[in-house]
Amino acid sequence: GGLGTRISEETHLKPKPMIEIGGRPILWHILKLYSAHGVNDFIICCGYRGYVIKEYFANYFLHMSDITFDMSANKMEVHERKAEPWRITIVDTGEETMTGGRLKRVASYIGDETFCFTYGDGLSDVDIKASIDSHRSSKKTATVTAVRPPGRFGILDMEGDNVSGFVEKPDGDGGWINGGFFVLDPAV
């Protein structure tokens, strides 16, 4: 939903989840992660340039398959359809809407089941199934994946005016931060 101001050279044309990594949008990678853990029913909260996401999935076979266009007959033939087991609901939740407002807007699509939630611009190797299992066994309303971030900058070891060593982005200060992957009960 955010505007992606830190990566504006990409996001003036498309929303952050549609920025490509390895030839596929970040959003595709997120869905593949969840799908690998058995989650295949998705609700995508759209904000800024949400139509780009809608167009991507509306034309998914064009993006993922070999295609022959017969211009004289006005026909298109899709070869080797690469289908995913996904069911995707795309909801316009507004450009300026905060996270809680987006969840409220899609509540009718969620129903009364426990659900997973993540941001559309973060990738990870989170064990989604383990997160769901942990959430269910804890009987909590909300479970968040916490991570310890690396330091933001490399550190120089100095001896007087000379650099004597360098540590590339050492571990952070030991604090935990929101890893961006949640398991939530509808009561949220």
Which residue ranges define each predicted feature?
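Conserved beta-loop-beta/alpha segment of the NTase-like Rossmann-fold superfamily
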Residues: 52-160
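Conserved nucleotide-sugar donor-binding
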Residues: 179-188
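N-terminal glycine-rich phosphate-binding loop and ensuing alpha1 helix
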Residues: 1-59
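Generic beta-sheet signal
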Residues: 21, 45, 93, 143-146, ...
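Short, flexible, basic/aromatic active-site loop/helix in glycosyltransferases
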Residues: 158-174
